[in-house]
Amino acid sequence: MCIRDSSEVTDWDDDEEVASIYYGEMTSLAKDLSGCSHALMEGHINRNPEQALMHPDYAPIQFVHSDFTETYGKAICDYYESDEDSPRNALKRANLGPDAVRNSARILILQFWRNVGEPQMDLPLALCDAESVSRAELQDFHVASYAGGDFGFDTFGVKAPDTNDRHRWFAFPKMTSDEVLMLRTYDSERAASGKPFWTPHSAFQDPNVPAGNPARKSIEVRATCLF
């Protein structure tokens, strides 16, 4: 889903400004879109050449994946009950206790992706219709550490389809910073009923843009929506 949505952030490289302004903006958007009671927002990822030099995990991901498997429900509950500062701060901002996630009737993860660089970049993002990808086409693998962190999780790789027209792909060319993509990456309710909760996605090389000229600059945040 592509949404027209502006932000008051003026410097996307300023982590403090992003945390103080953008987290609140995206929390409100997540609640409006989902109807959830609470939305926890903690951490963000800037994907740009400078960040990629610091850790390769911050480069645009050029293979088809969906972030989380069925095991993410337990992992995110454990995470918010940990002693780490980031989840504790997110709970504090929402005036919630550490058991709030585990005691929720439903957990929904919404990811928000925003282009903060040139409208036509070298590695834009493409999304695949979840209904066109079966569970049998998803391959689980474990990420023990992402960008040097200590939060491990299981993720989906997506197998190539039998025919080129099976998976339905969408891209949103020339996005500006006044637009945001929303994708669902986990839903405990849909997972429990065997319905697709994944959204396969990947960066891809725009054949009309030379590599790095201009390079992609984007920001991602993830909302843990509680019902």
Each language-model region and where it sits:
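Conserved small/polar residues in nucleotide/adenosyl-binding loops
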Residues: 1-5
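Short histidine-centered catalytic/ligand-binding loop motif
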Residues: 7-19
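Extracellular structured ligand-interaction cores
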Residues: 36-38, 107-111, 122-124, 180, ...
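Short, structured patches in soluble enzyme cores that scaffold and shape functional sites
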Residues: 43-45, 111-116, 129-131, 223-225
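Internal, well-folded beta-alpha domain core
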Residues: 86-123, 132-135, 141
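Double-stranded beta-helix
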Residues: 120-180
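Catalytic core of Fe(II)/2-oxoglutarate
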Residues: 154-227
